[in-house]
Regions:
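Metallo-beta-lactamase
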Residues: 2-143, 148-150, 159, 261-265, ...
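Active-site metal-binding motif and surrounding structural segment of the metallo-beta-lactamase
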Residues: 54-55, 148-196, 283-289
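Divalent metal-coordination and catalytic microenvironments
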Residues: 126, 136, 173, 180, ...
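Short, hinge-like loop/turn segments at secondary-structure boundaries
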Residues: 152, 211-214, 230-233, 307, ...
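Alpha-helix capping/helix-boundary segments
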Residues: 176, 200-201, 221
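Helix-loop-beta element that forms the nucleotide-linked donor phosphate-binding surface
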Residues: 204-218
Length: 367
């Protein structure tokens, strides 16, 4: 009897261990299958990887910022910071009412009109010199899963179908809130060329874009787009990654030189010396589009903090400023409308020419 009991206990223990191992194996397989979906893109390979490895900005197996940059700046461990970020409650994190927005028929805007339309967060359309430039369009999902990073009520006015034919798509880095797989796939046949930092082109090639349509640049490289149009790829202080391995593609800001406009496309990034260097190298910037929102003291080196926004605009010597990266998603622990107050303060207290349009409002570009 005791012998049978011992056998049963051993069998039960083995069953429990077997079940645990089976669950772990199932979870591992599920994660592998999940991160191998097309939307996660692909890390550089072949000739592109060779070019990446030759970049002066790629060292010790990853792209680096110009100066040492910690992702988390506090003394606490990363797990502690993530735990607080997930569970700390903030009043006003999301708006109680729908965000004000305007539905503009973009296809009816004449090609010769010099305008900009912001779609919330970091998505906007620039039209200048008869060219249409679409920056970081995110109209479907800002994360790998639909239930994370849900847009605020009222901000989902625009879809890929609302976009006119696009001459140039500009992507500053490959994070999900700047590079939306479903959006770019739906726009694929209506985009002339893609402008992106080194390594990001691998995602687009994987998603079916012809290599000839990819203008993939390292920092301080440029490309002639058309007569009177030049794009300069410039530094930013940030990081990259859609998969488990970070910093395998570059992040960047861009300077667009058009016949009647000089526009700085800031992307994401913390304050550093590159802003003053860009301002000196490219005098007469007509419009600087800067990050404002989704910041946190924990990430103060990789996102532009409010206390540095006015100084950044001055460093760039920009005639006008538009702030983005806000009013659509809650990706950091601050009130949803705090970035709007930051912009108002830059305008009123710092006496800067700051544009504060509603989502979908047509903004005239000064010639």
């Amino acid at each position: 009897m005791n012998y049978m009991r011992i056998i049963f206990k051993k069998f039960k223990a083995r069953m429990i261990v077997g079940c645990i191992l089976a669950v772990i194996a199932l979870l591992a397989v599920s994660v592998i299958v999940f991160i191998n979906q097309a939307s996660f893109g692909r890390t550089p390979r072949g000739e592109r990887l060779e070019r990446v490895m030759k970049s002066p900005n790629y060292r010790n197996g990853e792209f680096k910022n110009q100066h040492e940059t910690l992702l988390m700046t506090s003394d606490r461990g990363r797990f502690s910071g993530i735990w607080e970020f997930i569970f700390r409650k903030i009043d006003g994190l999301r708006p109680e009412q729908a965000v004000k927005a305007i539905k503009t028929d973009l296809r009816k805007i004449g090609r010769n009109e010099e305008i900009l339309v912001w779609f919330g967060h970091s998505s906007y359309l620039i039209q200048t010199g008869g060219k249409r430039i679409l920056v970081a369009p995110v109209f479907c999902m800002a994360s790998p899963v639909s239930f994370v990073n849900k847009p605020f009520k009222g901000t989902e006015l625009y879809t890929p179908d609302d976009m006119p034919d696009i001459d140039y798509l500009v992507i500053s880095h490959d994070h999900w809130d700047h590079l939306d797989y479903n959006t770019v796939k739906k726009l694929k046949d209506r985009i002339g060329a893609v402008i992106c930092p080194l390594g990001v082109g691998e995602h687009f090639e994987y998603w079916g874009f012809d290599k000839e349509r990819l203008i993939e640049l390292d920092w301080n490289e440029d490309a002639n787009l058309a007569p009177g149009f030049m794009i300069h790829c410039l530094p930013a202080r940030h990081f990259s990654g859609r998969r488990l391995t970070a910093n395998q593609s570059l992040w960047a800001s861009f300077l667009l030189e058009a016949p009647s406009q000089k526009i700085y496309i800031g992307g994401d990034g913390g304050y550093d010396t590159h802003y003053a260097e860009i301002g000196n190298r490219f005098p007469g910037i007509d419009l600087a589009i800067l990050e404002n929102g989704q910041y946190n003291e924990e990430w103060s080196l990789i996102h532009l903090m409010p206390q540095y926004m006015a100084q950044t605009a001055r460093d760039l010597k920009a005639k006008r400023v538009l702030t983005v990266h806000h009013s659509k998603y809650a990706l950091a622990k601050h009130r949803w409308d705090e970035p709007l107050k930051n912009a108002e303060e830059m305008k009123n207290k710092d006496s800067l020419n700051v544009l504060i349009p509603e989502i979908g409002e047509v903004v005239a570009l000064e010639k």
